Amino acid sequence: MTFPSDTFTTGQVLTAAQMNGIGDDINNLWRLTFRAVTGTSDTLVLADSYNKLITYSNTGTTTITIPNSSSVAFTTGAIVNILKTGATGTISIIQGSGVTISSAGATATNPVITATAGAASIIKTGGDSFTVVGRIA
């Protein structure tokens, strides 16, 4: 994400072009990009935590691994959004080495998504701790 390179001063009257540039940058803060996963395994990367929706469509079980902070330096409060798009299959979210997951799922440390259009957010709550919320089993 980049913002206008112009430097503005107090009391300056901005041109329409300058205002439009600022508006475009602000709009881009809310625009999601997509990453589609069709395979059976995925390890989250830093870029996944910024305005991204990861879609999973495999008909079998897809395993998502949350890596520890020495591998991927997610900031506290980082959110990774995931969506199951396939009609069949399951998404299983697992802990990388040293990672702790909590959720309201049947197995709190290994939440799964089974429903079509089931979505969840993985939130880093500190250190190597993550909470998974959403439509999980």
Model regions and ranges:
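Extracellular disulfide-bonded cysteine-rich modules/repeats
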Residues: 115-125
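Short, intrinsically disordered N-terminal pre-domain segments
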Residues: 1-20, 133-137
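Short capping/connector residues at structural and topological boundaries
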Residues: 8, 13, 49-50, 71, ...
